[in-house]
């Protein structure tokens, strides 16, 4: 192989001092000192104009003419010295197998200023042949920035081929940010495989899904003309790329929430889905969302726009809102899984100063699916970096808490005040483990009138796959009792301990550490990198005990949690449902232990109903306390046993009447009649996970205090 010295085409003095201008050492030619910036050499570190090659990548043999800097590294220098020659021939493994600038021109009219690369050469990514035959248009690779100054004269994407590269390619899908071209707008070329990314995305545990348990879970779907549920993913008309990603992810067959949600969303229906975390609801909205964007193609993508001030505004096709950083990150990683090797890109926005610049940088690379917390999203929209005009799909995850925890004004601002298509023009989906009536009424403001309501039985209640233990523990005995439980569980199992306050989480974790337990904590006062680090230590079992506040742990899907301990019981039984759902995931067996004392009397009756419904052991003292409250009239709960507690909510539209499909909008009862009537609610009911039996059922008038 020729040395870089032989590619110089100029003297060492010329490399060090071009016309009296000092050349920094890191831009010089390495061993010979003269291979960096001589008139014929270019920057041998960057594989630039003329003969210099990227030395570690094999070099550009056969150097061309009059050099200059490939990327200029102007740093306030004059652009005039940055015009290069014709470039070398990109044989052999240039720039780590990517053939960078092989065969292209030199460092054109713009140098490194404003992150613009050289004017010459194509970026023949993954190719081993000649480089692109035409120059970049006003700029080069630009650090993966897909701005309007970076498009070449041609737009073919030579995907992992070993022949000649296409003209001027500079991004993976260089027509995403360009006006649609009839010949290249079908996204026909799938991206190359990347073993490292595959290991990152698909190595997580999915084999632990207990589908036999899932088949026992009851499902109710209400609304007019509810789409038929599916039994297999092959029942859907999915794009072949996402079908392959589903198989690669190890999904054997759809879970109950997926069987009903995916066909409803594919059919253009809005959806309110009541399903517990861990039931597969993230895939239930991501699969139809990614599939729709793929099938719509780039012609339907709202192009990004660069303002006069140089700011680039992205217009996502889909928006997913969630209440916490961790849940947003979890959804983002799942979206990457289903969009793997497709032209679809996801972006992530959540609060915290330490990640802001990185989030904005990645956002500028392109965004079809945006996953965000409401506050950070509003901040970025106020800066003119995000527009909602092209958003055709809206998802609210953990919607009950989003609407109940003070996020409602922010959600309204995002949806109603930023030119987002109206609810009649978009598809909206809401998912949560519970949907009380008041939240349903609030959610209707964002949904079309004919939305589908889906109620999936609690995984861990009706399936009896979570053993629930309620124990009486006085406040001053909690730490001692907790350590007894931890010792009994052992280090081989993951244990999640819930407390009510951030201070309580820190104090308890500190105490357990002093007692030689491997423990970490997450709460709102920790920085984001600390929270992510602690979660990783917990997931991997390095620290098998996690002490968390409920808000910080909202929606987290952590496999293999064997034991959930409610060190502090919540004041709301719905929150109790969210918490115990962290164990017994995807149909597997788990244990939930709750410390109860006089402070928790307000939830005694509802807690008893849940225990009875799940056929769990009911302590005599809890039954007696609940009976005293019921007879004394001192508590207004949600109703007695058997009134649907096995679901996290029932469609309020069909709770107001009884009989066989009575008249009036929403006044009729039952699941009979299908779409043959104007009032009432046609739908499906299944005693198992997604059967197709359509039934007619009479409903008794619910107790008055059911939704109180």
Curated annotation (Swiss-Prot):
Catalytic activity: ATP + H2O = ADP + phosphate + H(+)
Complex and partners: Binds RNA as a monomer at low laf-1 concentrations and as a dimer at high laf-1 concentrations.
Top-rank taxon, per record: Eukaryota
Organism in which the protein naturally occurs: Caenorhabditis elegans
GO-annotated cellular components: canonical inflammasome complex; cell leading edge; cytoplasm; cytoplasmic stress granule; lamellipodium; nucleus; P granule; plasma membrane
GO MF annotations, alphabetized: ATP binding; ATP hydrolysis activity; identical protein binding; molecular condensate scaffold activity; mRNA binding; RNA helicase activity; RNA strand annealing activity
Gene Ontology biological-process annotations: cell differentiation; gamete generation; masculinization of hermaphroditic germ-line; negative regulation of gene expression; positive regulation of embryonic development; positive regulation of fertilization; regulation of translation
Residues the record lists as binding ATP: 275-282
EC number of the protein: 3.6.4.13
Tissue: Expressed in the germline and soma of young adult hermaphrodites.
Amino acid composition bias (Polar residues), ranges on this chain: 699-708
Biased composition (Basic and acidic residues): 72-83, 90-99
Gene3D superfamilies: P-loop containing nucleotide triphosphate hydrolases
Subcellular location: Cytoplasm; Cytoplasmic granule; Nucleus; Cytoplasm, Stress granule
UniProt keyword Transit peptide, yes or no: no
Name the UniProt record assigns to this protein: ATP-dependent RNA helicase laf-1
Compositionally biased region (Low complexity): 1-21
Motif position, Q motif: 231-259
Compositional bias segments (type: Gly residues): 48-70, 100-123, 630-647, 656-692
Disruption phenotype: Embryonic lethal or lethal at the first larval stage of development. Embryos exhibit severe morphological defects. RNAi-mediated knockdown results in embryonic lethality in 88% of animals. Knockdown also results in disrupted P granule organization and assembly in the early embryo. Reduced survival in response to heat and oxidative stress. Double RNAi knockdown with vbh-1 results in a high number of female offspring.
Motif (DEAD box): 397-400
Family indicated by similarity: Belongs to the DEAD box helicase family. DDX3/DED1 subfamily.
Free-text note regarding domains: The N-terminal domain is required for the multimeric binding of laf-1 to RNA.
Domain Helicase ATP-binding: 262-453
Region feature Disordered, mapped onto this chain: 1-191, 623-708
Effect of residue 430 to I: In q217; embryonic lethal
Name of the encoding gene: laf-1
């Amino acid at each position: 192989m020729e040395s870089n010295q032989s590619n110089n085409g100029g003297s060492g003095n010329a490399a060090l001092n071009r016309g009296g201008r000092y050349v920094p050492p890191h831009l010089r030619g390495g061993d010979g000192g003269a291979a960096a910036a001589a008139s014929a050499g270019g920057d041998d570190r960057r594989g630039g104009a003329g003969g210099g090659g990227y030395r570690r990548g094999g070099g550009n043999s056969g150097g061309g003419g009059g050099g200059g800097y490939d990327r200029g590294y102007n740093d306030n220098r004059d652009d005039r010295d940055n015009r290069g020659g014709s470039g070398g021939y990109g044989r052999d493994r240039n720039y780590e197998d990517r053939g960078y600038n092989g065969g292209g021109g030199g460092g054109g009219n713009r140098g490194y200023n404003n992150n613009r690369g050289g004017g010459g050469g194509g970026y023949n990514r993954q190719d081993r042949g000649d480089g692109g035959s035409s120059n970049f248009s006003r700029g080069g690779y630009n650090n993966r920035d897909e701005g309007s100054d970076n498009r070449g004269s041609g737009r073919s994407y030579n995907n992992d081929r070993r022949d000649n590269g296409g003209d001027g390619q500079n991004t993976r899908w260089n027509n995403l940010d360009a006006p649609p071209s009839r010949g290249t707008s079908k996204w026909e070329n799938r991206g190359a495989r990347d073993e490292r990314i595959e290991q990152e995305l698909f190595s997580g545990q999915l084999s632990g899904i207990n589908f036999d348990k899932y088949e026992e879970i009851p499902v109710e779907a209400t609304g007019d003309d509810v789409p038929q549920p599916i039994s297999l993913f092959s029942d859907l008309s999915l794009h072949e790329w996402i079908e392959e990603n589903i198989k690669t992810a190890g999904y054997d067959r759809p879970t109950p929430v997926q069987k009903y949600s995916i066909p409803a969303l594919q059919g253009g229906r809005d959806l309110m889905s009541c399903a517990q975390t861990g039931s597969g609801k993230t895939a239930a909205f991501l699969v139809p969302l990614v599939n729709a964007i793929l099938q719509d193609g780039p012609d339907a993508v709202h192009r990004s726009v660069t303002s006069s001030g140089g700011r680039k505004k992205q217009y996502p096709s889909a928006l997913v809102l969630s209440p916490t950083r961790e849940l947003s990150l979890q959804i983002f990683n799942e979206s990457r899984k289903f969009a793997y090797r497709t032209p679809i890109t996801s972006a992530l926005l959540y609060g915290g100063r330490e990640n802001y610049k990185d989030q904005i940088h990645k956002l500028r690379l392109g965004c079809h699916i945006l996953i965000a917390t409401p506050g950070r999203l509003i901040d970025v929209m106020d800066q003119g970096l995000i527009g909602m005009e092209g958003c055709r799909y809206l998802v609210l995850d953990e919607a009950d808490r989003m609407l109940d925890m003070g996020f409602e004004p922010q959600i309204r601002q995002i949806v109603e005040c930023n030119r987002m298509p109206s609810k009649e023009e978009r598809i909206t989906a809401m998912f949560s483990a519970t949907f009380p009536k008041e939240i349903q009424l609030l959610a209707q403001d964002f949904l079309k009138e004919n939305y589908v309501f889906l109620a999936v039985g609690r995984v861990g209640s009706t399936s009896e796959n979570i053993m629930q233990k309620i124990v009486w523990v006085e406040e001053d005995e909690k730490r001692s009792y907790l350590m007894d439980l931890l010792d009994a569980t052992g280090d081989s199992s993951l244990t999640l301990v819930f407390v009510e306050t951030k201070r309580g989480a820190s104090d308890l974790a500190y105490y357990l550490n002093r007692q030689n337990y491997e423990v970490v904590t997450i709460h709102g006062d920790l920085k984001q990198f600390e929270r992510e680090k602690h979660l990783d230590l917990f997931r991997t079992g390095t620290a098998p005990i996690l002490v968390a506040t409920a808000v910080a742990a909202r929606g987290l899907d952590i496999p293999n949690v064997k034991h959930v301990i409610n060190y502090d019981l919540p004041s709301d039984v719905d929150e109790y449902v969210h918490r115990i759902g962290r164990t017994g995931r995807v149909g597997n067996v788990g244990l939930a232990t709750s410390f109860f004392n006089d402070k928790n009397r307000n939830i005694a009756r509802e807690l008893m109903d849940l225990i009875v419904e799940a056929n769990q052991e009911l302590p005599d003292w809890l039954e007696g306390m609940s009976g005293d409250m019921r007879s004394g009239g001192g508590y207004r709960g949600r109703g007695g046993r058997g009134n649907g507690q096995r679901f996290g909510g029932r469609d309020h539209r069909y709770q107001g009447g009884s009989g066989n499909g009575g008249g009036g909008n929403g006044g009729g009862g039952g699941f009979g009649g299908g779409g043959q009537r104007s009032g009432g609610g046609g739908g499906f009911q299944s005693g198992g996970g997604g059967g197709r039996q359509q039934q007619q059922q009479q409903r008794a008038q619910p107790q008055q205090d059911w939704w109180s």
